[in-house]
Curated annotation (Swiss-Prot):
Disulfide bond positions: none
Region (Disordered) residue spans: 160-186
GO BP of this protein: cell motility involved in cerebral cortex radial glia guided migration; microtubule depolymerization; negative regulation of cell motility involved in cerebral cortex radial glia guided migration; negative regulation of microtubule depolymerization
Domain bMERB: 3-149
Record-level GO cellular component terms: microtubule cytoskeleton
A Pfam family of this chain: bMERB_dom
Protein name: bMERB domain-containing protein 1
Length: 203
């Protein structure tokens, strides 16, 4: 019994100290991480900040196009509904107008006046809707021009930076063995495929 107790005491003495928050525990964890402590960013290192910024601009542009399309569809629905309401009121008005004036009752005359006023209000509402759509269209054209200028300005320096970085990487990197050819497509090549090196096809 005394031998077992002495052995357990000896093993506990040799066991390394790993207290929560202790310096020994922190040092032990740091040694286990190894090269992982050298990681600075989890982002893809093949993309430059300029490429990331341009990609974000393209995504923002796509989002704007989707919002515009939703607005256009809402305008079309409102316009169709207004046209239906106007046509229904006109049809009812034509039926009342077809009745001779002497044969019309007081209620029919009042209804005729109400229909004329309703049709007038709906026509005005549709005119306002068309005017708003035209103003929105002009604003979108101005935004398209600004975005085209932005992409053109961003693509010029990015083209130079990509070419210089690609040439420097080609000098440092040895040629791959012929049995394992590799083809790397840079971010600029992807941008050219989408935007034609000047502006996005969406515009």
């Amino acid at each position: 019994m005394e031998l077992k107790q002495s052995l357990s005491v000896h093993l506990e003495a040799e066991k390394p100290l790993r207290r929560y928050g202790a310096v020994e525990e922190t040092a032990w964890k740091a040694e286990g991480l190894g090269s992982q402590l050298d990681i600075i960013s989890m982002a893809e290192t093949s993309m430059m900040p300029e490429e990331i910024e341009l990609e974000m601009a393209k995504i923002q542009r796509l989002r704007e196009v989707l919002v515009r399309r939703e607005s256009e569809l809402r305008f079309m629905m409102d316009d169709i509904q207004l046209c239906k309401d106007i046509m229904n009121l006109k049809q009812e008005l034509q039926n009342l107008v077809a009745i001779p004036e002497k044969e019309k009752t007081k209620l029919q005359k009042q209804r005729e006046d109400e229909l004329i006023q309703k049709i007038h209000r709906l026509v005005q509402k549709r005119d306002f809707l068309v005017d708003d759509a035209e103003v929105e269209r002009l604003r979108e054209q101005e935004e398209d021009k600004e975005m085209a200028d932005f992409l053109r300005i961003k693509l010029k320096p990015l083209d130079k930076v990509t070419k210089s970085s690609a040439s420097s990487r080609a000098e440092k990197k040895a040629e791959p063995p012929p049995s394992k050819p590799t083809v790397a497509k840079t971010g600029l090549a992807l941008i050219k495929d989408c935007c034609g090196a000047t502006q996005c096809n969406i515009m």
